[in-house]
Amino acid sequence: MVSIPEYYEGKNVLLTGATGFLGKVLLEKLLRSCPKVNSVYVLVRQKAGQTPQERVEEVLSGKLFDRLRDENPDFREKIIAINSELTQPKLALSEEDKEVIIDSTNIIFHCAATVRFNENLRDAVQLNVIATRQLILLAQQMKNLEVFMHVSTAYAYCNRKHIDEVVYPPPVDPKKLIDSLEWMDDGLVNDITPKLIGDRPNTYIYTKALAEYVVQQEGAKLNVAIVRPSIVGASWKEPFPGWIDNFNGPSGLFIAAGKGILRTIRASNNALADLVPVDVVVNMSLAAAWYSGVNRPRNIMVYNCTTGSTNPFHWGEVEYHVISTFKRNPLEQAFRRPNVNLTSNHLLYHYWIAVSHKAPAFLYDIYLRMTGRSPRMMKTITRLHKAMVFLEYFTSNSWVWNTENVNMLMNQLNPEDKKTFNIDVRQLHWAEYIENYCLGTKKYVLNEEMSGLPAARKHLNKLRNIRYGFNTILVILIWRIFIARSQMARNIWYFVVSLCYKFLSYFRASSTMRY
């Protein structure tokens, strides 16, 4: 069987979502590890006054492509930016571009999607479902297409606790929903959305389930594969450890925790944190397309790209490693010392929200007003709480994903491909990965230099001293207000102090006797 780089040699690849987190990592990996690929057609829309070519050039000039630039300085020649709007009829392709794509494309990677959990249902259906259907219809016209690779999500069927590598029946017929949305106004769409999505937490998950069904039904005559990643995080190894460029998912929470803004989150310590590195998702997508292209299986291949069943990690462990990393390597100008409390208790959660989030933010905004600056902390806390609401479903529940197809795919790889396109998450060392992830948010999202660590540590020590001083003043105030005025309170206080003194004396005496 040919190797993965040999399979992609001379192939023309069509990629959607190349300006997104996953898409740009896939583009970099494809060009670096399969250098003899012929060309990559990238569907990109105009945005903010930038042409598709300018947007692609901006992506290619980023740090992500540093390694590729060193190894292959001429890689840009293989990338062809094509003006396309996935939300428009026929993808808004010109006749000339459409003809080129139809005649040349061998492999499609469909990575584009709206990943906003609070997206309006109409918009989510447009990009995640209708655009997928239009791409399938375009693929059916392609003369030399070998594989259609669709990137979905492991949570598409999160209404099930055990999820196999199959496409399940959709919650509603996608065609009927699309037809209904055409005559509904936005108010009606918003009103019926909660009932439509049912026990799924948001429109993103709901529409990704519909998209899988569209791929299965509309692409029945195509050679289709689906990769379902869970929570996509920073890179594990490639192109370098810890690369991340956005605040989405856990990244924003990690940063908020490192800044000392996030103090509590509704989560179960024992719930599985099914994080999967972005380079694992990319490697699996490239390998899955290779397998389907070489073997042409009869049925659609689905791969649950998850970690929980083979290398389990829990949210309590995530919290520990994130906080310990940011205490050793603090973010600049932290608001408070990093410390996060996980709780699944509703009342306790809202208590900590009031005491640890809203009260300090309110007091800090008063301080900003008094010093002539614009208050901002309450706005930050409000945005943080909205993000927490969307994520708490995933931090409070656990699922079991079948990974038989993933194991089969791993066994099909030759020794060299197993190294180059590593998908074996059993090798993932979580403590090291989380540390690199946190450092990645510092370096690549916040653009903080590691040379600034001494100053950041000094600032963290200053915050510690402020906290100690505040606690001391608080104890004195409590003493003056409550204990000093009550004989019973004083007696209890003296008893506790005496007990502590006796315990310490006993401890010192025991230590002396041992030596």
UniProtKB/Swiss-Prot annotation:
Induction: Down-regulated by ether lipids/plasmalogen that induce its degradation (at protein level).
UniProt-listed Enzyme Commission number(s): 1.2.1.84
Ranges where the record places region Necessary and sufficient for PEX19-mediated localization into peroxisome membrane: 451-507
Cytoplasmic-side segments: 1-465
Transport found in the keyword field: no
Lipid bilayer topology: Single-pass membrane protein
Gene Ontology MF terms in the entry: alcohol-forming long-chain fatty acyl-CoA reductase activity; alcohol-forming very long-chain fatty acyl-CoA reductase activity; oxidoreductase activity
Pfam families hit by this protein: NAD_binding_4, Sterile
Transmembrane segments: 466-483
InterPro entries documented for this protein: FAR, FAR_C, Far_NAD-bd, NAD(P)-bd_dom_sf
GO annotation, cellular component aspect: peroxisomal membrane; peroxisome
Gene3D superfamilies reported for this sequence: NAD(P)-binding Rossmann-like Domain
CDD domains linked: FAR-N_SDR_e (cd05236), FAR_C (cd09071)
Phenotype when changing residue 480 to C: In CSPSD; increased ether lipid biosynthetic process in patient cells; increased FAR1 protein levels in patient cells due to impaired down-regulation by plasmalogen
Record's subcellular location: Peroxisome membrane
Keywords: Cataract, Disease variant, Epilepsy, Intellectual disability, Lipid biosynthesis, Lipid metabolism, Membrane, NADP, Oxidoreductase, Peroxisome, Transmembrane, Transmembrane helix
Record field: catalytic activity: a long-chain fatty acyl-CoA + 2 NADPH + 2 H(+) = a long-chain primary fatty alcohol + 2 NADP(+) + CoA; hexadecanoyl-CoA + 2 NADPH + 2 H(+) = hexadecan-1-ol + 2 NADP(+) + CoA; octadecanoyl-CoA + 2 NADPH + 2 H(+) = octadecan-1-ol + 2 NADP(+) + CoA; eicosanoyl-CoA + 2 NADPH + 2 H(+) = eicosan-1-ol + 2 NADP(+) + CoA
Quaternary structure note: Interacts with PEX19; PEX19 mediates the targeting of FAR1 to peroxisomes.
Family to which the UniProt record says this protein belongs: Belongs to the fatty acyl-CoA reductase family.
Name assigned to this protein: Fatty acyl-CoA reductase 1
Species name: Homo sapiens (Human)
Protein's gene: FAR1
